[in-house]
Swiss-Prot record:
Region (Disordered): 42-246, 931-950
Name of the gene encoding the protein in the UniProt record: XYLT1
Segments passing through the bilayer: 18-38
Pathway annotation from the record: Glycan metabolism; chondroitin sulfate biosynthesis; Glycan metabolism; heparan sulfate biosynthesis
Compositional bias per record (Basic and acidic residues), positions renumbered to this chain: 134-150, 166-193
Name assigned to this protein: Xylosyltransferase 1
Compositionally biased intervals (Low complexity): 91-104
GO terms, molecular function: metal ion binding; protein xylosyltransferase activity
Family: Belongs to the glycosyltransferase 14 family. XylT subfamily.
PTM notes: Contains 7 disulfide bonds.
Protein topology in the membrane: Single-pass type II membrane protein
Length: 950
């Protein structure tokens, strides 16, 4: 009887204590809700997501501490994290309370999926994903490595790891500690994998035969396979035709072996490493044949009037064009500008560029002084194959006894002349005994270190593998700079046919060198009997912008960090008119980036085309051609090209309909025949799809071309906010972001469920501000949200949120908010696939690809609590429709795809490439937009009386 009142009092006290504890927790949450800021993606000063040359392929950084509440009542700005600026206004109190209730500090149990909501992950809160730190680079004259190379760690040799999940223990550690912890964790994972292959940072030696030692009875009982071993982490099985002849102990060689894909390449890596280790690969001493002390540097003068004093015996030039890609019309325009009947043109097309090779063969047949190499190499950036291409081209040219040339000039399709042929011939005739190469312009020891000349490289599997260190041979001076040069015939003969100690050993040394063409000819010339003929000028202007061009963009094909020139723009035109030093060519030019500058230069040299000439502001570039085969297309591209063709047929039926019946109705047949990008006035206008279709009126096959253009999807908030830096600018989403030219190389933004989209924002000038970016999927699931600091000088920012795949097909939205007030938004399409591995998709594949990520969780944390704040309700009907769509196949799937494509693309026009039964269908050659329409600026015709084409 006495115990009962005591128990009741205890319960009341416990209840009061519990309420007090909950109140304290609520207050702590109010104070502690901290949304982490995110550094600018690719701003002018703070720069992009991970250009940093020093970084490894790594998991996304761990979340930083949560940021402070943005949605406080109006008042003094709350201080934000180091990357954020300003506090601000927020949604109403009721919305704030809901948002707060949905984002507790600790993870909460997963809510069961109810009607109108999709199941989401339990961790409900906001975490930012910081991009990697940026390494700043500077101009270093003419060669392709960063100037501040002492600060660049090129040990980017670890096998790629899977994207890491949220790791709370890293959240409050500084970035350096996070990296250390992640590195230790990766090392522990590698050690824990059975028979795992050593990765980056390990010095474990492989015994001869390539088999790793194993512990315990497993090693004794396991069946042995000679010259075979498994690598960890899903790496390819390591096989050798012959066992390596030494212990492979260098970390670079071990890493190269773990990443090489083919058995042949791994064999070559092992053999090369062992030959070098045994002292059988590199020359130790080389003979110098130059009698001069130091470096010769002849001064040459440019005289604008020299063309008037043409010599009686003008030089004849062998132009060697080393080209790749698909920009055939730009190549033809450049060829047209440099052509003269007195010169010779030898064209090498990359082994992987079959479309361009077909186009080059076609126009080369028209001219007797144009030939195409009967052999082809894959000339990767920085690869030894480029030097091999030049040396073989030189040998071929010297063996062509009917081509009496005097100078060797190498060009690419991205070059363009900036002075006339007559001026070039007059200048070279005056200095016919000289060789023109651009040197690096700094001390050799520093150049050797920055250029990686003291490192051993091997090219195989279309990759340059770094295998270790080496010594520079004694007895010679090493030089280098630009790999664009003009060499006279005497020196070319010496390099090609000489068997002396210098040439023989330098060819061996540079066969295992990164960017060998940037140094081989310089070094041989400076140490040869021809050393007094060197002119430190390659007669070119190269558009170096180290801040943009040194993004380590070639790390996927070379174990080093390099730079690339930027494309010229109209504002650069004045640079071509300088006369301080002799220059005759400039690079780089890209018509898909800017064609106006090419037109300006062309008109400056050769005058304007006649008034009314068609196609001068248009540019077409092929991205698919039927002989390439559909295996050359991705499933996303093949899916959308088919949908674009059907969109064109529907336009023909609706807009070209005539009373006579079905004469303008078609049924699609087969795969697309070709696809072109179409630009007008340097603006992307969409795709041109050439495709086959059966005319239903006559049951005959016709070939048509459809023009589809993306609809405008970027819009400023209405009513406009007081935030003005996005006005007249843009927000875009895509893949293949080019940080150098600051555009998406995936023109049109064709995306599928397994793509990893990047968000890009272009800014106007203004004060430093912080904006919030929110990604919303087709059923209003908030997939990601993060802050970006836009500095006053920033023009672009970009970031790729680490979303779990697959993405849900449909129309996505990216919103930009300032102080949680909408500023702008854009939309992008994630297309459902109708093809998988270039075959019609199977029913068992559609649900895996079209139903979104597991439990609809795009990231570790959920942002479901922000839906009411942002007025983004999740509709049960919309969710159910998405579920049904995800299981669609056949005609139902095509109908779903076409409805999505029709909402984001417009069929602008359609034409017939040949005979047609549709009486109102226009012929493609009579349109201004078709890839079959006239293009005089790139068309090659008969040689004119003055010997030129232009």
């Amino acid at each position: 009887m006495v115990a009962a009142p005591s128990a009741r009092r205890l319960v009341r006290r416990s209840h009061s204590a519990l309420l007090a504890a909950l109140t304290v927790l609520l207050l702590q949450t109010l104070v502690g809700w901290n949304f982490s800021s995110l550094h600018s993606g690719a701003g002018e000063r703070r720069g992009g997501a991970a250009a940093g040359c020093t970084e490894q392929p790594a998991p996304p950084p761990a979340p930083a501490p949560r940021r402070e509440r943005r949605d406080l009542p109006p008042g003094p700005a709350a201080p934000l994290g180091a990357c954020c600026g300003g506090g601000g206004r927020g949604p109403p109190a009721r919305a704030r309370a809901r948002a707060l209730a949905g984002c507790p500090e600790e993870p909460r149990p997963q809510q069961p999926a109810g009607q109108g909501a999709l199941p989401t992950r339990a961790l409900d809160g906001y975490f930012s994903h910081r991009p990697k730190e940026k390494v700043r680079t500077d101009s270093n004259n003419e060669n392709s490595v960063p100037k501040d190379f002492e600060n660049v760690d090129n040990s980017n040799f670890a096998p790629r790891t899977q994207k890491q999940k949220h790791q709370p223990e890293l959240a409050k550690k500084p970035p350096s500690r996070q990296k250390e912890l992640l590195k230790r964790r990766l090392e522990q994972e590698e050690k824990g994998k059975g028979q795992s292959f050593p990765g980056k940072g390990t010095h474990e030696a492989l015994p001869p035969g390539g088999r790793a030692a194993v512990n315990g009875s497993h090693g004794k009982d396991a069946p042995r396979q000679p010259h075979t071993r498994k690598s960890g982490g899903g790496s390819p099985e390591l096989r050798y035709d012959q066992p390596p002849k030494c212990d492979i102990s260098g970390k670079e060689a071990i890493s190269a072996l773990s990443r090489a894909k083919s058995k042949h390449c791994r064999q070559e890596i092992g053999d090369t490493y062992c030959r070098h280790k045994l002292g059988m690969l590199m020359p130790k001493k080389v003979t110098r044949f130059c009698s001069l002390e130091g470096k010769a540097n002849k001064n040459v003068q440019w005289d604008e009037d020299s063309v008037e004093y043409m010599l009686a015996n003008p030089v004849r030039i062998a132009f060697v064009l080393v080209v790749h890609g698909r920009a055939s019309r730009q190549l033809q325009r450049m060829f047209k500008a440099i052509y003269h009947k007195d010169h010779f043109y030898y064209i090498h097309v990359d082994k992987r560029s079959n479309y361009l090779h077909r186009q080059v063969l076609q126009f080369a047949r028209q001219y007797g002084n144009v030939r195409v190499t009967p052999w082809r190499m894959a000339t990767i950036w920085g690869g030894a194959s480029l030097l091999s291409t030049y040396l073989q081209s030189m040998r071929d040219l010297l063996e062509m006894t009917d081509w009496p040339w005097d100078f060797f000039i190498n060009l690419s399709a991205a070059d363009y002349p900036i002075r006339t042929n007559d001026q070039l011939v007059a200048f070279l005739s005056r200095y016919r005994d000289m060789n023109f190469l651009k040197s690096h312009g700094r001390d050799n020891a520093r150049f050797i270190r920055k250029q990686g000349l003291d490192r051993l490289f091997l090219e195989c599997d279309a990759h340059m593998w770094r295998l270790g260190d080496r010594r520079i041979p004694e007895g010679i001076a090493v030089d280098g700079g630009s790999d664009w040069f003009l060499l006279n015939r005497k020196f070319v003969e010496y390099v090609t046919f000489s068997t002396d100690d210098l040439v023989t050993k330098m060819k061996q040394f540079y066969s295992y060198t990164l960017l060998p063409a940037e140094s081989f000819f310089h070094t041989v010339l400076e140490n040869s009997p021809h050393c007094d003929t060197m002119v430190d000028n390659n007669l070119r202007i190269t558009n170096w912008n180290r801040k943009l061009g040194c993004k380590c963009q070639y790390k996927h094909i070379v174990d080093w960090c390099g730079c690339s020139p930027n494309d010229f723009k109209p504002q650069d035109f004045h640079r071509f008119q300088q006369t301080a030093r002799p220059t005759f060519f400039a690079r780089k030019f890209e018509a898909v980036v800017n064609q106006e500058i090419i037109g300006q230069l062309d008109y400056y040299l050769y005058g304007n085309y006649p008034a009314g000439t068609p196609g001068l502001r248009s540019y077409w570039e092929n991205v698919y051609d039927e002989p390439d085969g559909i295996h050359s297309l991705s499933d996303v591209a093949l899916t959308l090209y088919h949908s674009f063709a059907r969109l064109g047929l529907r336009r023909a039926e609706s807009s070209l309909h005539v009373e006579t019946g079905n004469s303008c109705r078609y049924y699609p047949m087969g795969h697309p025949a070709s696809v072109h990008l179409y630009f007008l006035a340097d603006r992307f206008q969409g795709f041109l799809i050439k495709h086959h279709a059966t005319n239903l009126a006559v049951s005959k096959l016709e070939t048509l071309e459809t023009w589809v253009m993306p609809k405008k999807v970027f819009k400023i908030a209405s009513p406009p906010s007081d935030f003005g830096r996005l006005q007249f600018s843009e927000v875009r989403v895509g893949t293949d972001w080019d940080a150098k030219e600051r555009l998406f190389r995936n023109f049109g933004g064709l995306l599928g469920p397994m793509d990893e989209p990047v968000g890009m924002q272009k800014w106007g000038k203004g004060p430093n501000v912080t904006v919030t970016v929110i990604w919303v999927d087709p059923v209003n699931i908030i997939a990601a949200t993060y802050d970006i600091l836009i500095e006053s000088t920033a023009e672009f920012t970009h970031y790729k949120p680490p979303l779990n795949l697959p993405l849900r097909p449909g129309v996505w939205t990216v919103k930009i908010l300032h102080h949680w007030v909408p500023v702008a938004e854009t939309k992008f399409l994630v297309a459902p696939l109708t093809f998988s591995n270039r075959q019609p998709i199977k029913p068992e594949e559609v649900l895996k690809l079209h139903n979104g990520p597991l439990r609809s969780a795009y990231m570790e944390q959920s942002f479901q609590s922000l839906n009411p704040v942002l007025s983004l309700p999740i509709s049960p009907a919309q969710v159910e429709q998405a579920r049904r769509n995800a299981g669609s196949t056949g005609a139902t799937l095509e109908h779903w795809l076409d409805s999505l494509v029709g909402g984001t693309w417009t069929a602008m026009d359609i034409c017939a490439t040949g005979p047609t039964a549709c009486p109102v269908m226009q012929t493609c050659t009579h349109t201004a937009w078709s890839s079959f329409s006239p293009d005089p600026k790139s068309e090659l015709g008969a040689v004119k009386p003055d010997g030129r084409l232009r």
